[in-house]
């Protein structure tokens, strides 16, 4: 395994849970500690141009071992884990030769069940790495880090022909800031792949267009006994606002290429209320229409209010569908598809119902689709990964690197 599993277990021992709404990047010190550890590991392994930025981004180069010119490619994974669930004191469990049925997670009542997660039926005989039911696992995306480094080490030791390969490990992907301070010019690759996907074979170059929406509602509070014609209940206005949105266009009612409105939080009193939404859609025109709809609803619900009472809406775009950029470079996808086929893997092309660092990087001039890690059920206690999936990811990374050099020689 060339330390693949050892690396992974080492990386998940770092608590790198990201924090939302923090101005600094990285948002947590644990990410910086892992970045420093990776910097040292890469230096020890003999990588060149190993750097660690002020914002916790690690970069390094595996130098070419061929004499002909080869395009510089890159592989990228992220340091942080989801803010939605604890990543502290992760205690991975190894289940060898999975035979089906429920898997106990630690000593409590938590189980990983094929009833809830039918994908387990496809993984009989595999080696599973699970949580102990108290934390997430961190395969998203420390598996990606372990797979990239292991692939680079194997390329070097086995003398597989390859050009210059750049690797990078970024902070705060889970809170949408992973690419904010990524220096594309310094990375200096013609294209790259994030290793941040799910099950074996996943290859993704489409993601949501995404925006966050903050709504502030100011009402007027008086004694309810004498409130007629005077009270303006901010909570009632918030309720009216939400009810104007389509009930079947929410995350729990959508899949595939469907977009949605998602109310993430609501709080308030009669005097004042706040609502926070995210808006997602694959189609740019539909995305713009969703945002316009939210503004129009605010105008309708707020119409006729006393001038001291109002509804304020602020919309911030987060990222866009990288398909717009990737389709200009079809060879990047074709190369990954061929690499998977050469590794006896059927490529599974599917849209990302979320975002990756690659989405933002693609709009910064670094086309960057996403490939699988072998993991499942991210962001919670049921997260798990298969050792076979991890090995397959390593093989695909190596084959992409080899094919790039081979095609450059033939062209």
From Swiss-Prot:
Residues where Zn(2+) 2 binds: 140, 174, 379
Listed InterPro entries: ArgE/DapE_CS (IPR001261), Bact_exopeptidase_dim_dom (IPR036264), Peptidase_M20 (IPR002933), Peptidase_M20_dimer (IPR011650), Peptidase_M20B (IPR010161)
Cross-referenced Gene3D superfamilies: 3.30.70.360, Zn peptidases (3.40.630.10)
Binding residues for Zn(2+) 1: 78, 140, 196
Any GO BP: peptide catabolic process
Keywords of this entry: Aminopeptidase, Cytoplasm, Hydrolase, Metal-binding, Metalloprotease, Protease, Zinc
A Pfam family of this chain: M20_dimer
HAMAP family the UniProt entry points to: Aminopeptidase_M20 (MF_00550)
Matching NCBIfam families: peptidase-T, PRK05469.1, PRK13381.1
The protein, known as: Peptidase T
Organism: Yersinia pestis
Gene that specifies this protein: pepT
